[in-house]
Amino acid sequence: PNKMIQKENVYLVGDAATQVKATTGGGIIPSLKAATTLCDCIINKKDYNKEFKKQSGRELLLHLKIRNVLNKFSDRDYDKLLGLMNQEKVKKILKKYDRDTPIPLVLNLLLREPRFLLFSKFGF
C-alpha cells in the first residue's frame, strides 16, 4: 500500500502496483478502479499516487490487515470464526455488503455481532 505508483510519466496499475485484495488475492476490481483514477489524473494533471490512496488506499490496507490477522489463526480460531459467520444475522450482512469494500462490511459485522472483536487480539 505504500508503494510509489507514479514517477514522472511512468505509472503502475494492478499487480505491479500491489493493487490487490490481500484477503482473496483478487485484483480485477482494484485494478479497474486504479485505471479509472489514472485516466482522470492524466487528463486533469493530478497526482496519481495521492489520488489512488485517497480513493482506494484505506480499503486495500484493511484487506491487508485482515489477511495479517487471518495468517495468525489456529484451526480453533477458524472454527470460532465460522461459528459466528454461520448465524442468520451475520449471513444477512454478508449478502448485503460487498467484500470489495470491507470497511462497511466489517463495521456492520461488529455492530451486529460484537464477538468478532475477540479476533482483535491478533492485532489490527
Enumerate the predicted regions with their spans.
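Structured catalytic cores of enzymes that bind and process phosphorylated ligands/cofactors
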Residues: 2-4, 9-11, 29, 33, ...
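A conserved FAD-binding loop/helix module that cradles the flavin
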Residues: 20-42
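C-terminal auxiliary extensions adjacent to catalytic cores
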Residues: 77-124
